[in-house]
Amino acid sequence: YIPENVNLYPYLTGIENLDYFCRLAGKNYNQEKLKEILLDCGLDLIDFDKKVNTYSKGMRQKVGIAIALAKEANIYLLDEPASGLDPLASTELSSILKNLSNSGAAILMASHDIFRIRETCNRIGILKNGELVKEMDTTSVTTKELENIYIEYMKD
């Protein structure tokens, strides 16, 4: 699970947080593997050993993504995972999610970024007041059509 606001231990470093949460999940990685995971999630090498309380929201989000990926789950639940990420990091996240999906993982993501969803996911569901009002395959709708559908359902 990757929440919109990742809760990390502020006085631990990024790599210490990753190591801690991996161990809680029964994963005991060496330092090189932990670094590889953080790099794959877009965190800069120079930031690995900085305390998390000095991180931006986007940097904390990258550590949260790394924690989820390190657990090697079959199902990932994401709540606004690109929140706080710059456009490059958001594109990197999309690539990571596509790779996970292609390797057989199921991904359920809540997001208001309908354009990112379209390029990342296979299916789209639109919720309104907690109810699924529209479901479609991403290959069956253009970006403009998706925008129009979203606007139509969000009126009122």
Residue spans for each PLM region:
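Conserved ABC ATPase "signature" region
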Residues: 19, 23, 31-47
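A short, surface-exposed alpha-helical micro-motif characterized by mixed small hydrophobic
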Residues: 117-119
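Catalytic Walker B motif of ABC-type/P-loop ATPase nucleotide-binding domains
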Residues: 76-79
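Helix N-cap at the start of a conserved alpha-helix in ABC-type nucleotide-binding domains
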Residues: 87-88
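H-loop/switch region of ABC-family ATPase nucleotide-binding domains
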Residues: 111-112
